[in-house]
């Protein structure tokens, strides 16, 4: 009988033999990789996108970000770079976010890829931090297996697109990261410590909603039955202290918004104002539940105001009351459900118009932090329902894939202003502001007729839209329709007498209609409002020149260059008139000052070169005219003038070469033909001499 030999095996390849700790670590790594992937993939379509919507104001034209003003002034400026104490300030104080823009600008300047990469990284970090908080809450409330599914939903939810794909939305991302990190710290330590306070401050200095971290922490303590009176008092004191300091930064003043920003806030009836607010709250909730028709701007007719009880939307308070009653009923059954609801509601409070008026009616970006509570809520509901549905996993995967697809498409729409505004028009065709924005983009791209059509639509939807009146008037003026332009611009300044740009544009239209008295009055009205407008002074100078007041024209242009040394049109016109008045010595005297400000302005070089030639400084003249040609190689005038200069210097071959370039650019140029003929006759005469 054969004996069977059994060999001892020192290890096993069976994954089932792994310890629970190893399994947990492996699953944790898998979950993290899935969340990182899902946070990045939907937003790949926005990489390399332009600066769109309010990016120009918060980044490109922000003097702190672009380095025109010292970085230390970040603490005295609002989010848009204006002085926080100014009456025109938006009163949004977010120095942490602005500092990250400053760093981006230092590294990438106006190349947008780096900005978008940072935003996507921030969204990924926010998702991972949310996952960490969710795992902690699972243990506190004994309600397991919700953190991962909630975090997946958070990673791919389409309502986050504005916060992630729009670079300016970084304020929401940073605020949420610091807020959730503070909550993680609080859940772990229970007591208030320096790290928690620092994270709350960083969150608040990223965006004002961050202050709501403290009430959320209080709710966690209360629902987890671990609150004590002393800790509660410290929390309230911290909330009051940070809130007081934040209001002190604003000088205890609220931002001043217009009816265009938030129409509901300007309703005369407090009753209907409250009804409209409740509808707006429900609409935000609707965007979380059904994120299908997303829009970058919901103002100006997109959501019409409720002004009668016959409007079904007037039932919004009843619906909210019903939801609250249902929530109260479930609070004892599931504390995690209650916390999720409170987390969403509390973090939304700063945008609710309850405590102060905000500068929008509906905004998707403000839902970034509140959506964390919503995602937890969805995970809890899904877990409860999955018990009763066999194919719950298939349905959830299908839903996630649909959300990824929607987010990917939506983030692609944020890539350019044209695609963004076009998508907005399909959702809110009655929004005058979208028509206005689309008109502006089309006009900037040279599509004048399409731009005019959108401006007319904006004015039709809102006849008092003075900015649309101004832009359309300006566009029509450029196309030669000064009469219609004058009519539109006159309406704009009637609607807003302090509209300096419209007064200036009205003056230009009146000047082109030869209404010089009215034009001068309009331009001076503009300067009364904005005395340091170099462009308005330039146009006033043009008016003086047309009415044969050369000295006053030169004075206006000199003032323009004093205010803005880089105003090239003023330098050019000033030099032309000085040359015309035989004052070339002044042109030469001012040339260094001009070229130090506008070194790459071809017309300035040309005029300086012309004056040097008149003073027989041929070498200097040649250098400046050549510089002008280098900057504008296709200018017939520049090549012709260089040919004339060479002819005066008896450098006939070089003169002939310049005239032939002129004729190649403009075959009918009479001056070049005549001068070339003279050169040929001269050469022929010289060749016949003995």
Curated annotation (Swiss-Prot):
Record's GO cellular component, any one?
Answer: endoplasmic reticulum
Stated role: Transfers mannosyl residues to the hydroxyl group of serine or threonine residues.
Report TM segments. 33-53, 111-131, 139-159, 167-187, 235-255, 274-294, 308-328, 342-362, 366-386
Basic and acidic residues bias spans: 15-24
> Can you state which reaction this protein catalyses?
a di-trans,poly-cis-dolichyl beta-D-mannosyl phosphate + L-seryl-[protein] = 3-O-(alpha-D-mannosyl)-L-seryl-[protein] + a di-trans,poly-cis-dolichyl phosphate + H(+); a di-trans,poly-cis-dolichyl beta-D-mannosyl phosphate + L-threonyl-[protein] = 3-O-(alpha-D-mannosyl)-L-threonyl-[protein] + a di-trans,poly-cis-dolichyl phosphate + H(+)
First and last residues of every TPR repeat:
398-431, 432-465, 466-499, 500-533, 534-567, 602-635, 636-669
UniProt entry tagged with the keyword Transmembrane helix: yes
- Top EC class of this enzyme: transferase
E.C. number(s) listed in UniProt:
2.4.1.109
- Cited SUPFAM superfamilies: TPR-like (SSF48452)
The entry lists its GO molecular-function terms as: dolichyl-phosphate-mannose-protein mannosyltransferase activity; mannosyltransferase activity
Q: Which GO terms describe its biological process?
A: endoplasmic reticulum unfolded protein response; protein O-linked mannosylation
Q: Which UniProt keywords apply?
A: Endoplasmic reticulum, Glycoprotein, Membrane, Repeat, TPR repeat, Transferase, Transmembrane, Transmembrane helix
Spell out the protein name for this chain. Answer: Protein O-mannosyl-transferase F38B6.6
Q: Which residues lie on this side of the membrane: Extracellular?
A: 54-110, 160-166, 256-273, 329-341, 387-690
Region: Disordered; residue ranges are 1-24
Q: Which residues lie on this side of the membrane: Cytoplasmic?
A: 1-32, 132-138, 188-234, 295-307, 363-365
Q: Main site of residence?
A: membrane
Any one Pfam family match given in the protein's UniProt record, by short name:
TPR_17
Entries under InterPro entries matching the protein: O-mannosyl-transferase_TMTC, TMTC_DUF1736, TPR-like_helical_dom_sf, TPR_rpt
Glycosylation sites per record: 166, 559, 600, 617, 686
The family annotation for this protein states:
Belongs to the TMTC family.
Its pathway, per UniProt, is:
Protein modification; protein glycosylation
The entry's localization annotation reads: Membrane; Endoplasmic reticulum
């Amino acid at each position: 009988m054969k004996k069977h030999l059994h060999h001892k095996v020192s290890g096993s390849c069976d994954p089932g033999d792994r310890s629970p700790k190893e399994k947990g670590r492996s699953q944790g790594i898998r979950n993290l990789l899935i969340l990182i992937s899902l946070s990045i993939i939907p937003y790949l379509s926005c990489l390399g996108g332009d600066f769109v919507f309010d990016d120009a104001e918060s980044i490109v034209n922000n003097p702190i970000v672009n380095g025109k003003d010292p970085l230390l002034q970040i603490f005295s400026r609002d989010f848009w770079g204006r002085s926080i104490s100014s009456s025109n300030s938006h009163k949004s104080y977010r120095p942490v976010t602005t500092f990250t823009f400053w760093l981006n600008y230092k590294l990438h300047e106006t190349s947008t890829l780096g900005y978008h990469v940072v935003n996507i990284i921030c969204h990924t970090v926010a998702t991972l931090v949310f996952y960490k908080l969710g795992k902690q809450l699972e243990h506190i409330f004994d309600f397991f297996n919700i953190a991962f599914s909630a975090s997946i939903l958070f990673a791919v939810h389409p309502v986050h697109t504005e916060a992630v794909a729009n670079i300016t939305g970084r304020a929401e991302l940073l605020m949420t990261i610091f807020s959730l990190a503070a909550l993680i710290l609080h859940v772990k330590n229970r007591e208030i410590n320096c790290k928690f306070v620092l994270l709350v401050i960083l969150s608040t200095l990223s965006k004002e909603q961050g202050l709501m971290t403290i009430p959320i922490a209080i709710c966690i303590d209360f629902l987890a039955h671990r609150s004590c009176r002393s800790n509660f008092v410290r929390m309230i004191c911290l909330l009051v202290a940070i809130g007081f300091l934040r209001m002190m930064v604003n000088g205890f003043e609220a931002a001043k918004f217009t009816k265009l920003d938030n129409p509901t806030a300007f309703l005369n009836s407090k009753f209907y104002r409250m009804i409209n607010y409740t509808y707006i709250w429900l609409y935000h909730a609707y965007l979380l539940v059904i994120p299908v028709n997303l829009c970058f701007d919901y103002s100006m007719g997109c959501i019409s105001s409720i002004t009668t009880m016959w409007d079904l939307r007037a039932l919004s308070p009843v619906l909210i009351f019903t939801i609250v009653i249902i929530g109260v009923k479930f609070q004892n059954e599931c504390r995690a459900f209650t916390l999720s609801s409170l987390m969403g509601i509390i973090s939304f409070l700063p945008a609710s118009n309850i405590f102060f008026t905000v500068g929008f009616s509906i905004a998707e970006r403000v839902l970034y932090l509140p959506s964390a509570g919503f995602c937890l809520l969805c995970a809890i509901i899904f877990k409860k329902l999955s018990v009763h549905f066999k194919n719950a996993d298939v349905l959830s995967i299908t839903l996630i894939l649909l959300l990824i697809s929607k987010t990917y498409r939506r983030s692609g729409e944020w890539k350019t202003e044209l695609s963004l505004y076009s998508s907005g028009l399909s959702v809110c065709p009655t929004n005058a502001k979208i028509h206005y924005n689309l008109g502006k983009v089309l006009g900037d791209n040279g599509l004048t007729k399409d731009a005019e059509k959108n401006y007319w639509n904006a004015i039709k939807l809102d006849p008092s839209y003075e900015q649309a009146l101004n832009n359309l008037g300006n566009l029509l003026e450029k196309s030669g329709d000064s009469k219609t332009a004058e009519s539109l611009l006159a309406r704009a300044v009637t609607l807003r007498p302090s509209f300096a740009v419209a007064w200036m544009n009205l003056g230009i239209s009146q000047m082109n209609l030869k209404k010089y008295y009215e034009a001068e009055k309009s331009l001076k009205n503009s300067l009364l409002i904005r005395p340091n407008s170099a462009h308005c002074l330039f146009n006033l100078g043009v008016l003086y020149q047309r009415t044969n007041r050369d000295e006053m024209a030169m004075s206006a242009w000199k003032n323009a260059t004093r205010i803005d040394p880089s105003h090239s049109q003023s330098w050019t016109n000033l030099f032309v008139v000085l040359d015309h008045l035989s004052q070339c010595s002044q042109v030469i005297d001012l040339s260094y000052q001009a070229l130090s400000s506008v070194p790459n302005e071809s017309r300035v070089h040309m005029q300086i070169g012309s004056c040097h030639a008149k003073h027989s400084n041929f070498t200097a003249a040649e250098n400046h005219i050549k510089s002008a040609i280098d900057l504008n190689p296709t200018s017939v005038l520049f090549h012709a003038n260089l040919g004339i200069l060479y002819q005066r210097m008896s450098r006939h071959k070089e003169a002939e070469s310049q005239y032939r370039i002129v004729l190649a650019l403009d075959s009918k140029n009479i001056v070049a033909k005549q001068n070339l003929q003279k050169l040929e006759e001269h050469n022929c005469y010289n060749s016949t001499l003995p």
